[in-house]
């Protein structure tokens, strides 16, 4: 456990982790402060952060399981102590950590007798189990058991459908939220017009993210929500998708690309690969799958084109804009 004394700054707004501990493999705790704040600001930030921590965070869960010769999820299998329903409930409790984008498959294939734990799950390299000791099932006889799993990264929760899927797999209720609880409290100090506040944030996570990682991600999510308000109305366009309209800023580097074409210098972009831009793995993989390999490929796509890429979101476009802004040397005249 890490604990620090709280020192109040009288100048620049600062944040600090004042307590950090791991109570178990599936329970992390962090306590943070932000100060100095003017009266009322601590509550504004605290409420927004708590909602973002509990509702906007992405997590990774097992969402489907499939095995041969299972008539229904309340049946029992000879040689297995638990019912199918109990096995599905145990799989629901497995805590995973990943940089996965979308879904992937995993596998359990064991021979009894013996105990099956999370350690027996064969995972892709992008997924990690936080607690290998989590119990799944007990084989009481020398039988072979193979279970195919689907792993998904998402946010919020997903309630299983009452019936199995057409391929015979069984849905599993998924709670994607890595933050188990979040609280904020306020300490006021000073007098009269000089009254100021310290915001205390407490975060509990399941190990999918550490509290500090959760704080950073929630902050980024909040910033992304407010970005559209930083652009004047005339410099935006509307993307219509199934009756939903989304406002996005214009791609600021298109004009620069047009100027370079006039100077016949755009060919240099063919030799700047997106690998050099240090993109997040998920964005990088989506671009690669869409045959976007170079900076020229990227700049030749409008934001409308990018948003149509499978598994691509508005936040990803904004992240690309931020990265391009930081790499102006690649796009200079």
Curated annotation (Swiss-Prot):
Nucleotidyltransferase is among the record's keywords: yes
EC number: 2.7.7.6
Location in or out of the cell: Plastid, Chloroplast
Predominant place of localization: plastid
CDD domains: RNAP_alpha_NTD
Catalytic activity: RNA(n) + a ribonucleoside 5'-triphosphate = RNA(n+1) + diphosphate
InterPro entries listed in its UniProt record: DNA-dir_RNA_pol_insert, DNA-dir_RNA_pol_RpoA/D/Rpb3, DNA-dir_RpoA, RBP11-like, RNAP_asu_C, RNApol_insert_sf
Region (Alpha N-terminal domain (alpha-NTD)) residue spans: 1-233
Subunit comment: In plastids the minimal PEP RNA polymerase catalytic core is composed of four subunits: alpha, beta, beta', and beta''. When a (nuclear-encoded) sigma factor is associated with the core the holoenzyme is formed, which can initiate transcription.
Protein name, entry field: DNA-directed RNA polymerase subunit alpha
Lineage summary: Eukaryota, Viridiplantae, Streptophyta, Embryophyta, Tracheophyta
């Amino acid at each position: 456990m890490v604990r620090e004394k709280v020192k109040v700054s009288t100048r620049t707004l600062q944040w600090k982790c004042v307590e950090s501990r791991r109570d178990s493999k599936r329970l992390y705790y962090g306590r943070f402060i932000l100060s100095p704040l003017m009266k009322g600001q601590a509550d504004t930030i605290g409420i927004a952060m708590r909602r973002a921590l509990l509702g906007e965070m992405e997590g990774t869960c097992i969402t489907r399981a499939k095995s041969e010769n299972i008539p229904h999820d309340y049946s029992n299998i000879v040689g297995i102590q638990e019912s199918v329903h109990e096995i599905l409930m145990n799989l629901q409790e497995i805590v995973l950590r990943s940089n996965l984008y979308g879904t992937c498959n995993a596998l359990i294939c064991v021979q009894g007798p013996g105990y099956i734990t999370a350690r027996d799950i064969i995972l892709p390299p992008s997924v990690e189990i936080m607690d290998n000791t989590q119990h799944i099932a007990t084989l009481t006889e020398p039988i072979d058991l193979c279970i195919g799993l689907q792993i998904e990264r998402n946010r919020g929760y997903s309630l299983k459908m009452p019936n199995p899927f057409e391929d015979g797999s069984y849905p599993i209720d998924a709670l994607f939220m890595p933050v188990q609880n979040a609280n904020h409290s306020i300490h006021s100090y000073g007098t009269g017009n000089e009254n100021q506040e310290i915001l205390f944030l407490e975060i509990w996570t399941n190990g999918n993210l550490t509290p500090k990682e959760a704080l950073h991600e929630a902050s980024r999510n909040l910033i992304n929500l407010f970005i559209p308000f930083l652009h004047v109305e005339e410099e935006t366009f509307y993307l219509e998708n199934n009756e939903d309209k989304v406002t996005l800023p214009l791609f600021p580097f298109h004009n620069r690309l047009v100027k370079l074409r006039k100077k016949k210098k755009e060919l240099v972009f063919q030799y700047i690969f997106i690998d050099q831009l240090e993109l997040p793995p998920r964005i990088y993989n989506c671009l690669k799958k869409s045959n976007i390999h170079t900076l020229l490929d990227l700049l030749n796509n409008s934001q409308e084109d990018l948003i149509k890429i499978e598994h691509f979101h508005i936040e990803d476009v904004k992240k690309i804009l931020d990265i391009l802004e930081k790499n102006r040397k690649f796009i200079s005249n």
